[in-house]
């Protein structure tokens, strides 16, 4: 098992001024399973780092990836069809590429939980690999 990280908790763990910093940092530091970042999440995190933090925060995150603190999960062939299906099915809910990609990776890796602050979208999405997924932090 692993803990999949969506954009919100990963970014909040880096930004000490973020309202969710303490909870997200604690969640990440307490994790005993591998921490997995879906590759599309890195693009969103980079955007928020460039907007709100010093670029050194991105370099530090990449260093952590390089040293194995985080694993990166790329999308693979069948994931793109699932992303397409999710974007189509939930079009009225403004489910975008990154959220759909995160769920596709959670499903492919058969994970029971997801670290996300996006309760609006992930509370709505229904995974196909289980009845529901646990959203953290609680």
Predicted regions mapped to residue ranges:
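Acidic, PIN/NYN-like endoribonuclease modules and their adjacent C-terminal/linker elements
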Residues: 103, 107-138
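Alpha-helical structural signal
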Residues: 39, 58, 99-102
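Active-site neighborhoods of divalent-metal-dependent phosphate/nucleic-acid chemistry enzymes
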Residues: 72-117
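Short, well-structured N-terminal submotif of metal-dependent ribonuclease cores
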Residues: 1-37, 50-62, 128-132
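Alpha-helix/helix-capping structural signal
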Residues: 8-9, 40, 78, 120
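Short, conserved active-site loop motifs that form the nucleotide-linked donor/cofactor pocket
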Residues: 70-71, 133
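A general alpha-helix detector
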Residues: 6-10, 44-45, 82
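Histidine- and aromatic-rich ligand-binding microenvironments
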Residues: 3-6, 37-38, 95-96, 118, ...
């Amino acid at each position: 098992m692993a803990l999949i990280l969506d954009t919100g908790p990963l970014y909040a763990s880096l930004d000490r001024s973020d309202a969710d910093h303490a909870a997200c940092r604690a969640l990440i530091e307490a994790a005993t399973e591998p921490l997995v970042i879906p590759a599309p999440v890195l693009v969103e995190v980079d955007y928020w780092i460039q907007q709100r933090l010093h670029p050194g925060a991105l370099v530090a995150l990449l260093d952590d990836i390089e040293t194995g603190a985080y694993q990166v999960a790329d999308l693979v062939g069948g994931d793109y069809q699932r992303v397409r299906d999710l974007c189509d099915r939930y079009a009225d809910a403004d489910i975008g590429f990154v959220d759909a990609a995160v769920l596709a990776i959670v499903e492919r890796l058969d994970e029971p939980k997801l670290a996300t602050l996006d309760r609006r979208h992930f509370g709505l999405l229904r995974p196909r690999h289980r009845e529901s997924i646990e959203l953290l932090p609680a």
